[in-house]
Amino acid sequence: MLQPKRTKFRKVHKGRNRGIASGTEVSFGTYGLKAVGRCRLTARQIEAARRAMSRAVKRQGKIWIRVFPDKPITEKPLEVRMGKGKGNVEYWVALIQPGKVLYEMDGVSEEVARNAFALAAAKLPVKTTFVTKTVM
């Protein structure tokens, strides 16, 4: 699963998921899966969607993952009283804003790409839409 090799700090503040997304254009492939809402994508969700897509295209084409989980999320163990410091890092998330392209695909027909992205979207906690590369 995806996670950073090294980080400057082990734990981070919770923060808020506001603002507008960067990476809103399809830049590597021909087709893309774009987020419509905001959410926190876990590394497990990113990997599950990637597997669903790669199984759907049957080793044809190429898939790009445009998001990376770089924020650590901590949890305290079960039945532990409050206080005594912040919990341990349990998983990593990527903060997603509306308009962010999550995945891209190339080397397959549009019908196959739509089908693969539909399977991937079912694994994700955010509403998504299918986009194509716009050539100026």
Swiss-Prot record:
Disulfide bonds: none annotated. GO terms for molecular function: rRNA binding; structural constituent of ribosome; tRNA binding. Part of the 50S ribosomal subunit. GO terms for biological process: translation. It comes from Haemophilus influenzae (strain ATCC 51907 / DSM 11121 / KW20 / Rd). It comes from the Bacteria. One of its GO terms (cellular component) is cytosolic large ribosomal subunit. This is Large ribosomal subunit protein uL16. The gene is rplP. Belongs to the universal ribosomal protein uL16 family. The keyword Amino-acid biosynthesis does not apply. The keyword Transcription regulation does not apply. Keywords: Ribonucleoprotein, Ribosomal protein, RNA-binding, rRNA-binding, tRNA-binding. Binds 23S rRNA and is also seen to make contacts with the A and possibly P site tRNAs. It holds the Pfam family Ribosomal_L16.
